[in-house]
Structures are given as structure tokens and as C-alpha cells.
Amino acid sequence: MAVTDVFARRATLRRSLRLLADFRYEQRDPARFYRTLAADTAAMIGDLWLATHSEPPVGRTLLDVGGGPGYFATAFSDAGVGYIGVEPDPDEMHAAGPAFTGRPGMFVRASGMALPLADDSVDICLSSNVAEHVPRPWQLGTEMLRVTKPGGLVVLSYTVWLGPFGGHEMGLSHYLGGARAAARYVRKHGHPAKNNYGSSLFAVSAAEGLRWAAGTGAALAVFPRYHPRWAWWLTSVPVLREFLVSNLVLVLTP
């Protein structure tokens, strides 16, 4: 069975439209948005593990690199997965406020580019929408492979710069260029964007991710995270994938 066979059944147009509808809440109601995304992500990880191990990931340990305040912790705990969140920014760790103070799991303040874990420590290593926020995304990916046990899963998902959501809260102005979009945001709002080009947001292409994954010798699959199964072919078309694959998932095993 291919690693994506189980998840492919879930990757329907209805799911894509539901997730797209919830994106409008990312800035104004992040708890609502991330609960939906967390449930979908936990289901995706469960499907990928089931396809490769013929059993659900119950009792396994997952490391969430760049987990922020732990929005994903409850979803994975509910699935029976042990959760460890890593986040370098103390403000992000507490961004969810009191509603998430009792969240399950373990939380560590550290950089994803220098994970404070021993080699072969976890069963699953996940990074969801983080690679575009660090200056060396493939160093992050290499660290994820290092801490994952042989036969485990590494799932690195990131927003493609030239896709429609590449500019984050800067909107489609990123097509004018990152620096110009950042300056335009400051003029309009009077302060830099949270996801500020050049400091907390970087231009990461689909081609870069595919090249890195292939170079590791550990790649199992690549697919567009939010697209229905019938649109996954887009990842195989150079140039087109940069604009139409909004979020790329790289699945690897050490």
C-alpha cells in the first residue's frame, strides 16, 4: 500500500472547500481556525501511519516542530498519540491564552533548526506551516529526520511562496515582491505584518522542497495538502505547481 492510499480517500472536494472556508478565521479567530486544522491534521497523520504500518498511531510519540501554543495537542491526544510541542517564541507559546492552559502534552521552547532531542527519539515528526517562517527550512527538515526513529514518519508541510496564500496577511500583494509587499503593509496598517517578509516570512518554493526531499533518499510521497485527490497531479508540473499548489506536504521515513 502506498503511503497516501488511505488519506487519498479523505482528500475530497468537500474537505477542501470546508478548510478553505475556515481560512477566513485565521487572523480574527485563530482558536476556531486551528481547531479545524488540528483535527484535519491529526486525521491526515493517522491515515499516513496506518498506510505504512497497518495500524493506527495509538501509543506513538509525535513531535510538533513549531507547534505554537499547542492548538494541535488536544487533537493528537484525543487520537491516542503522545504529543511534544517545540516552539522558539515565548509569545507564540502563550498566544492562545487561558483556553489552552490545560492542554495535554509536553512543551519545549527551542528552535526547529536545532532540536534538543537525541537521535531516533520520536515515532512521528510533524512540521505544519513552519518552514516558510525560518531562514533555513531544510536545516529544519534535516533535524526532523535526525530525531525520528528508523521506520517512523516525517511530515513537513509548508506554504508555497507563489501560491495564493504565500503572502499570509499581506494578501496577494506578495506577487509584487516580498519587500514591496511588506512595505505596502506597513503603509496601510502602521506596523509590520506579524509574518514579515525577510524576518519571519521567507520565499520557499515547491521546487526547493521537492529537491531537498529527493536528495535525502528518504522521501515516500509529496502531495498538495488542501487539494482534492484528483488535483494532486499539479505537484508534478514545474512552474504551475508554484502558483497552484498552495501548501506542499513532504512525507519521509528515516
From Swiss-Prot:
InterPro entries in the record: Methyltransf_11, SAM-dependent_MTases_sf
EC number: 2.1.1.-
Pfam family, one: Methyltransf_11
Example GO biological process: methylation
Induction, as annotated: Induced in response to the thiol oxidant diamide.
Keywords noted in UniProt: Methyltransferase, Transferase
One Gene Ontology MF term: S-adenosylmethionine-dependent methyltransferase activity
Signal peptide: none
Gene3D superfamilies from the UniProt entry: Vaccinia Virus protein VP39 (3.40.50.150)
Enzyme class label: transferase
The protein's name: Uncharacterized methyltransferase Mb0229c
Organism the protein comes from: Mycobacterium bovis (strain ATCC BAA-935 / AF2122/97)
Lineage of producing organism: Bacteria, Bacillati, Actinomycetota, Actinomycetes, Mycobacteriales
